[in-house]
From Swiss-Prot:
It comes from Bifidobacterium adolescentis (strain ATCC 15703 / DSM 20083 / NCTC 11814 / E194a). One of its GO terms (cellular component) is cytoplasm. The lineage of its organism: Bacteria, Bacillati, Actinomycetota, Actinomycetes, Bifidobacteriales. Residues 64-142 are annotated as: Domain II. This is Holliday junction branch migration complex subunit RuvA. Residues 143-145 are annotated as: Flexible linker.
Length: 205
């Protein structure tokens, strides 16, 4: 079992990153917020979970242990596989996800692509009361080292305007790459990236 990787980011796209460890490149699927804060050459530590199915062997990665724990917890719900669990963590950070379960907020959970209202209600029914909030809350830092608080600010700004976290994080990553804006973002770049990301999202409607 591969439980953790420490190495350098070789490349990153909208759904996964290649992390080079000792000359071997591992393809790791990760939540959107983690991917948005990563860049080639960056040294990072990623907590991982290996999923083996009939069709593929997939390595999932997370910037925090809390995020990994939530990923595993979600899969205890019947009918919830790793793809939907990752979709949930790309829509809501682990602390907000745990709070939504605790509060019975099916509407917040149902925003995750591939889930739906019935699936959200099932998660609440099966997990409510079983998640230790003290281990989750306040633990939404991404895999970035140092943390890319600038990118997080942009993503939060886009979410306040009604965009899903997954779409917002992808837009931030894309506009930074397309416009050669270095990450972690400097404070002075935040307004520009927010404007570019918003334009990109509006164009894609």
């Amino acid at each position: 079992m591969i439980g953790m990787l420490r190495g350098h980011v070789e490349s990153v796209d909208a759904v996964s990153a290649i992390i080079e460890v000792g000359g071997v490149g591992y393809e790791v699927r990760m939540p959107s917020a983690d991917l948005a804060s990563m860049h080639a050459g960056q040294e990072i530590k990623v907590y991982t979970s290996l999923n083996v199915s009939q069709d593929a062997i997939t390595l999932f990665g997370f910037g925090t242990l809390a995020s990994k724990r939530m990923f595993l917890q979600l899969q205890k719900v019947s009918g919830i596989g790793p793809k939907v669990a990752l979709s949930l963590l790309s829509t809501l950070p682990p602390d907000r996800l745990a709070r939504a379960v605790a509060d019975g907020d099916a509407t917040a959970l149902a925003k995750a692509p591939g889930l739906g209202k019935k699936g959200a209600q099932k998660i609440i029914l099966e997990l409510k009361g079983s998640i230790d909030l003290s281990q989750i809350e306040g633990s939404s830092a991404t895999a970035s080292t140092p943390e890319d608080t600038g990118a997080e600010q942009v993503v939060e700004g886009l979410m306040s305007l009604g965009w899903h976290q997954q779409d917002a994080a992808h837009a931030v990553q894309t506009v930074c790459a397309d416009n050669q804006i270095e990450t972690p973002l400097n404070a002075k770049d935040v307004p520009r990236v927010l404007k570019l990301a918003l334009t990109s999202l509006d164009r894609g409607r």
